Design a protein with these regions (language model features):
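Bacterial N-terminal signal peptides that target proteins for export
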Residues: 2-11
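Acidic/histidine-rich helix-loop elements
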Residues: 121-138, 220-227, 278-287, 314
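Divalent metal-coordination and catalytic microenvironments
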Residues: 108, 118, 156, 163, ...
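Active-site metal-binding motif and surrounding structural segment of the metallo-beta-lactamase
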Residues: 51, 58, 130-179, 195, ...
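Cap/insert and terminal regions of metallo-dependent hydrolase folds
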Residues: 24-50, 142, 151, 158, ...
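Catalytic core of the metallo-beta-lactamase
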Residues: 105-111, 206-268, 284, 288-292
């Protein structure tokens, strides 16, 4: 008799090979007369050095990671702080705060506006309920403890950054405006959400006294076999009279950080991914190492660095507690004081 798990394991390994957000972007040719990152049927990275890992390298990585996730998942409990959300539900409008919920999910409170980045309260970064990277630690803030959410920024469509159940819960409970890169508005509409504004790189929108600018990132997009790079990926800049905030989402290191710093900086705070960087033959063009994150922080001309995208989902080969140690070491090597290179506990809130 064939047990169900003997079928599920190879199927899950295949599914994970498709959905784990750790492969390289799909290269396509630019369209004449269009922005350089626009391509036939979708979008492309413009860095001439960008190189996609070969098919065998990707295949072996995905199968190995998928099998390990199912048969020998790693465990890690990130440091956390109790946060019942009471202070967040009665904020001081003159004291901007930021709270790390986990991975790339941040609650930003500025000028009376409550904004979330890449909200994810799900148990897995996967389309499957029984397979895929499982959350290692509970969210730092319970969904029910959120203050009223006015705006939501989405960087791209990968399952660790765009969780369908979470955004549907947000739409039902808070009715926020979602700001998304090109191509994602239709995905939201297909899932019953219409308060969505989509932007191309360097386009901006004004909402509730804030200017939000969609800025380039070096990454890729994909949620299935059939939609590789049909939707754009991006970072975001939030500009208010008293503060400037940069949210990196997912990106490999490239000249776009310096360009964003020159065009929109200096920033008061830059939240940049520091995890999912090994193996380098897979990750090097689409995820920053902790050292590259510190360089990006300097390129952005930011006052504060916040390392995110670590310790929540097991997406790379590096030790799960390594990214913060490497980021702090690199900041120290460059003479950046510890109070400018932030690593948060889950649920931690700081003024910025």
């Amino acid at each position: 008799m064939v047990h169900s798990h003997t079928v599920r394991l190879p199927l899950a390994a295949l599914a994970l090979a498709l959905v784990l957000p750790a492969c390289a972007g799909v290269g396509t040719e630019p369209l004449p007369g269009r922005p350089a990152h626009h391509a036939e049927g979708g979008f492309r990275n413009t860095n001439p050095e960008f190189k996609r890992p070969d098919g065998w390298t990707r295949f072996t990585f995905f199968v190995r990671r998928g099998w390990a996730t199912l048969t020998a998942p790693r465990t890690y409990e990130a440091p956390r702080r109790d946060n019942d959300g009471s202070a967040l539900r009665a904020p001081d409008p003159g004291a901007p705060t930021i709270t790390w919920v986990g991975h790339a999910t941040l609650l930003v409170q500025l000028a009376g506006v409550n904004l979330l980045t890449d909200p994810h309260w799900g148990e897995r970064a996967s389309p499957l309920s029984w397979a895929g990277p499982r959350r290692l630690s509970p969210p730092g803030l319970a969904f029910e403890r959120l203050p009223p959410i006015h705006l939501v920024l989405i960087s791209h469509d990968h399952f660790d950054h765009l969780d369908l159940d979470t955004v549907k819960r947000l739409a039902a409970a808070h009715d926020p405006l979602f700001l998304v890169p090109l191509g994602l508005k239709q995905w939201f509409a297909d899932n019953g959400m219409t308060r969505v504004e989509e932007l191309d790189w360097w386009q901006g929108a004004e909402h509730r006294g804030l200017r939000l600018v969609c800025v380039p990132a070096q990454h890729f997009a994909q949620r299935s076999l059939w939609d590789a790079n049909r939707r754009l990926w991006a970072s975001w800049a939030l500009i208010a009279p008293e503060r400037r905030f940069y949210f990196g989402g997912d990106s490999g290191y490239f000249s776009g950080f310096r360009e964003a710093g020159e065009r929109l900086g200096p920033f008061d705070l830059a939240a940049i991914a520091i995890g999912a960087y090994l193996p380098q033959e897979i990750m090097r063009f689409t995820h920053t190492t902790p050292e590259q994150a510190v360089q990006a922080f300097e390129d952005l001309r930011a006052r504060q660095l916040l390392g995110i995208h670590w310790g929540t989902f097991d997406l790379g080969d590096e030790p799960l507690d390594e990214p913060p140690r490497r980021m702090r070491a690199e900041a120290q090597r460059r003479g950046i004081p510890p109070d400018r290179a932030w690593i948060f506990d889950l649920g931690e809130t700081r003024r910025w």
